[in-house]
Amino acid sequence: MTKQVAVLLADGFEEGEAVVFIDIMRRLDIEVDVLSCMETTKLQSYFETCISADDTLSNHCHQFYDAVMMPGGPKGTDNLSANPMVIEFLKRHIEADKYICALCSSGAKVLAANHLLQGRNYTTGGGLEKRFEDGHFVDQKVVIDGKFISGKGLGVSFEFAFSVAKALLTDEQEKVDWQASHIYFEH
């Protein structure tokens, strides 16, 4: 059965983190729904690149995915964190034991800020872990704690994406390894 991932974007998201993740998932035949958490599918990234999402979260808020991913970006994570629909969507996926994948500031500013880590280990960028009490910060590039996968930031985007892929495609590790080798990524 094909795995499905939702990528949650809001104005101000870190485009490099999002695009690398989406690319790796799609190379591995994982279905990706890029969902805008704003009122429109047209989004402006952290560095003012205009990107269109596939649809809005409001049209998919009752759907379940195998994983939910959030990139960083200061304003993007502020927008995600302040959106009650995003928090409810994440809570439903946590309760359903789905993968929650947070890159860069989203680990702290979305998950920890809304008490969604519940003591789990995670990593985040920029010293943001000092602002929130929820979760246990681990100073590593990528941290996996059960169904929670977090990465420090843009520089670890490939490692993060392949970590998520390996978790989702447990029966297809050779495919994941081949794709990593094919793009000259050592993991």
Question: Which residues make up each language-model segment?
Answer:
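Active-site-adjacent pocket-lining segments in enzyme domains
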Residues: Q4-V7, D11-F13, R26-S36, A53-D55, ...
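Short glycine/proline-centered loop/turn elements that form peptide/ligand docking sites
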Residues: V19, S36-E39
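Short, solvent-exposed amphipathic alpha-helices that sit
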Residues: E17-R27
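A cross-family phosphate/adenosyl-ligand binding-site feature
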Residues: S45-A53
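Short acidic-hydrophobic surface loop/beta-edge motif
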Residues: T41-S45, Q140-V143
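Short N-terminal binding/cap micro-motifs at the start of the first secondary-structure element
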Residues: F13-E17, K42
